[in-house]
Amino acid sequence: MGTRLLPALFLVLLVLGFEVQGTQQPQQDEMPSPTFLTQVKESLSSYWESAKTAAQNLYEKTYLPAVDEKLRDLYSKSTAAMSTYTGIFTDQVLSVLKGEE
């Protein structure tokens, strides 16, 4: 796999994984209407549901607790680093805007 394809694939699988793990909301029953827009909406909804099901099956098949723990650790370390660098950047911007006293 190319280096460009790997992050894109990772992000798509991550988004689908979060969608699969999200809470299920009950769908409201609507009156069937034969309009074109409703048919398109139902078609897109069925495609989305099949993609979610496929992603859930793939996630369940390839779930590795060690990888999950590493990803959680990587996320916590990267957010800690980003908050540190954001604080430094904010201090620098404020000192530039405030000027010398």
Curated annotation (Swiss-Prot):
GO molecular function: lipase inhibitor activity; lipid binding; lipoprotein lipase activator activity; molecular function activator activity; phospholipase activator activity; phospholipase binding
UniProt subcellular location: Secreted
Protein name, entry field: Apolipoprotein C-II
Organism (species): Homo sapiens
Chain segments carrying region Lipid binding: 66-74
PTM info: Proapolipoprotein C-II is synthesized as a sialic acid containing glycoprotein which is subsequently desialylated prior to its proteolytic processing.
Chief location category: secreted
Disease (UniProt): Hyperlipoproteinemia 1B: Autosomal recessive trait characterized by hypertriglyceridemia, xanthomas, and increased risk of pancreatitis and early atherosclerosis.
Gene Ontology biological process terms in this record: cholesterol efflux; cholesterol homeostasis; chylomicron remnant clearance; chylomicron remodeling; high-density lipoprotein particle clearance; lipid catabolic process; lipoprotein catabolic process; negative regulation of cholesterol transport
Alphabetical keyword list: Chylomicron, Disease variant, Glycoprotein, HDL, Hyperlipidemia, LDL, Lipid degradation, Lipid metabolism, Lipid transport, Secreted, Sialic acid, Signal, Transport, VLDL
GO CC terms of this entry: chylomicron; early endosome; extracellular region; extracellular space; intermediate-density lipoprotein particle; low-density lipoprotein particle; spherical high-density lipoprotein particle; very-low-density lipoprotein particle
Region (O-glycosylated at one site): 23-38
Tissue: Liver and intestine.
Signal sequence annotation: 1-22
Encoding gene per record: APOC2
Entries under PANTHER family matching the protein: APOLIPOPROTEIN C-II
Family: Belongs to the apolipoprotein C2 family.
Function: Component of chylomicrons, very low-density lipoproteins (VLDL), low-density lipoproteins (LDL), and high-density lipoproteins (HDL) in plasma. Plays an important role in lipoprotein metabolism as an activator of lipoprotein lipase. Both proapolipoprotein C-II and apolipoprotein C-II can activate lipoprotein lipase. In normolipidemic individuals, it is mainly distributed in the HDL, whereas in hypertriglyceridemic individuals, predominantly found in the VLDL and LDL.
InterPro entries registered for this protein in UniProt: Apo-CII, ApoC-II_dom_sf
Region annotation Lipoprotein lipase cofactor: where it falls in the sequence: 78-101
